[in-house]
Regions:
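Class I S-adenosyl-L-methionine
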Residues: 1-123, 128, 146, 151, ...
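Generic, well-ordered alpha-helical scaffold segments in large soluble proteins
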Residues: 69, 73, 97, 101, ...
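Short, well-ordered loop/turn elements at secondary-structure boundaries
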Residues: 79, 105, 137, 162-164, ...
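S-adenosyl-L-methionine
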Residues: 127-156
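A generic structural motif
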Residues: 136-144, 258-265, 504-511
Length: 553
């Protein structure tokens, strides 16, 4: 290093760049004379940065051992690349590993938004080259740039034009656009609802997405017609979303594979993550093979079977006839975002709110409440929580409570600030004490309810308690009934081995919500009842006609 410093000390930065390129391959190491002077003055680069930046950037640096293993797998799957792109290179684990593992690289492009990381990576590559001199190096371009403003098209088109094998590798940030928004991060794409969601879905957060998902989809769209492949560390949920998008995008991707990693061991974070592999230039594939990263043991296959997105293609085929359209409407429970005020506990006949205060209001507005954790451990007529329900339908004017339920109105008014401080835009412009997930169905005498959060799916039947219907919160889904016989029949269908098997072939157990409304609405219970030869009167079907279903024998 001392010899290098002596060589570049009295040169201008352009000549210094030529010297360094001949040593390690980095193109344009310095962008100015001042940068060269600073380099000489400060050989030890301070790469410390505040924890908030780490959160904003979704910054979990990849261990070298993991990056090298991924490069080995990439090499075996897609061959030795001529050109490599690392779009969010951080401290450069993938850059260093690829330079070691890929023998035929002609050009390497690394992009990183954190300028301190860029300085550290350049120095790391230079030191490696000085310690292990070589007569040939690929041209290495390291850009201090934002992915969302960087133009990849000329690089990718050059690779296509030359017929090169291209590798896209890396570990894009594991952070959502909403997290970055809350932290006022600049490392965020333009506001985009990438799934074109409308209305309530977009408002309540279904349009929230991982930055890594945006990055991956963008690069897949640009790279699909090239030779080579992609190897990315991604959250499992992101990989599923990419496969979901593939159904409509029909990108030229094949040999799609997900290899499960132990993120706790590798990154010391509790996240379900994998290495995602896909080959460019193939006929569109809609299936992903899942295996263990360390043992290479095959686990299962998920993806699209006809028009169905399933978690296990093999088990799905045996029960696919029951995947269709539900004749019953599943609804989520009450959403209020004001638990400390609306959710109550009952002890010795006295209600207490989440602030520890005694609550004395009209009893007819208070209902038993089941949350997700209660459903899987449900015992009849035993409730941890009760809920004050200020509306019987969405949009109802709660000012009428001032006359019909003065105690409740006074109580709600006391905590008006708590309601007005609710962050979700769903409440904007609505009644000040508004709730959602409420309607005539909420007050039906019989309900089948299920938690959306638990891997072990349990459907239970609940009925009136002390003459009151049981409410569920928005982590649960419900079917409502006037007839106990009909409710029991449908409960039997939901708990049948056929529906249980179907659900297991559809759910992803590492999802935030294991059970979703869209999944429940595809359970064809009427088909199952027909197969069982069961009959009971019901007018709950989409065509409005009365059909006959009954309890299973």
């Amino acid at each position: 290093m001392r010899n290098l410093i002596n060589r570049i000390h009295d040169t201008d930065y352009t000549e210094a760049n030529s010297i360094i390129k001949s040593l390690c391959g980095i193109v344009n190491y310095f962008s100015s004379e001042q940068e060269k002077i600073d380099f000489i003055s400060h050989l030890e680069v301070d790469i410390s940065f505040v924890q908030e930046d780490k959160v904003s950037y979704g910054d979990w640096q990849t261990p070298i051992s993991l990056a090298e293993k991924i490069c080995d797998i990439h090499l075996s799957k897609f061959g030795s690349p001529d050109i490599v792109i690392e779009p969010t290179c951080g401290l450069g684990a993938f850059v260093v590993s690829a330079l070691r593992k890929f023998p035929n690289i002609k050009e390497f492009y690394a992009i990183e938004i954190n300028h301190k990381y860029v300085s550290e990576l350049k120095l790391k590559i230079l030191l490696n080259a000085l310690n292990s001199p070589s007569h040939s190096h690929p041209d290495i371009y390291i850009y201090n740039a934002d992915f969302f403003e960087f133009d990849f098209i000329p690089i990718i088109e050059k690779s296509k034009r030359k017929g090169w094998n291209m590798a896209v590798i890396g570990n894009p940030p594991w952070v959502t656009n909403s997290t970055q928004g809350r932290n006022n991060s600049k490392n965020i794409p333009f506001k985009s609802n990438i799934y074109n969601l409308k209305g309530i879905d977009a408002i309540t957060g279904k349009s929230n997405f991982d930055i890594s998902e945006y990055i991956t989809l963008k690069l897949l769209q640009l790279s699909q017609i090239n030779n080579g492949g992609i190897s990315f560390l991604l959250k499992n949920s992101v990989i599923r979303n990419i496969l979901t998008k593939q159904h409509t995008e029909r990108l030229n991707l094949g040999n799609i594979e997900q290899k499960l990693i132990d993120a706790s061991m590798e990154f010391d974070v509790s996240v379900d993550a994998s290495c995602f592999f896909a080959q460019f230039g193939c006929s569109p594939s809609f299936i992903c093979n899942v295996s263990d990263f360390y043992s290479n043991t095959y686990i299962q296959q998920f993806g699209w079977v006809n028009e169905s997105f399933v978690s296990d293609t093999k088990s799905y085929s045996a029960v696919s006839k029951y995947y269709g359209k539900s004749s019953y409407i599943w609804r989520s429970g009450i959403k209020h975002d004001c638990a400390s005020i609306l959710e109550l506990t009952l002890s010795n006949g006295v209600y207490t709110n989440g602030l520890g205060e005694t609550v004395q209001i009209e009893e007819d507005l208070i209902y038993p409440l089941l949350k997700s954790s209660d459903i899987n451990n449900y015992q009849e007529n035993q409730f941890r929580k009760f809920i004050l329900v200020p509306q019987r339908k969405v949009g109802q004017d709660t000012s009428e409570l001032k006359y019909s339920h003065p105690l409740a109105f006074s109580y709600l008014s006391k905590y008006e600030n708590a309601f007005s401080s609710r962050k979700s835009s769903i409440y904007k412009g609505k009644d000040k004490f508004s709730i959602f997930g409420i309607g005539d169905y909420s007050f039906k005498p019989y309900k089948i309810v299920v938690s959306s959060l638990y891997k072990s799916i349990r459907f239970i039947l609940v009925s009136l308690t002390d003459g009151k219907p049981i409410m569920v919160d928005d982590t649960c889904y419900q079917l409502d009934f006037d007839s106990l016989d009909e409710a029991k029949c449908i409960l039997d269908a939901l708990n049948s081995k056929e529906i249980s098997s179907l659900l297991q072939s559809l759910i992803f157990k590492d999802a935030k919500r294991v059970v979703t409304k869209s999944l429940l609405m595809r359970l064809d219970l009427t088909q199952l009842c027909r197969d069982k030869g069961a009959t009971i009167a019901s007018q709950r079907f989409n065509n409005g006609a009365t059909q006959q279903l009954s309890l299973f024998d």
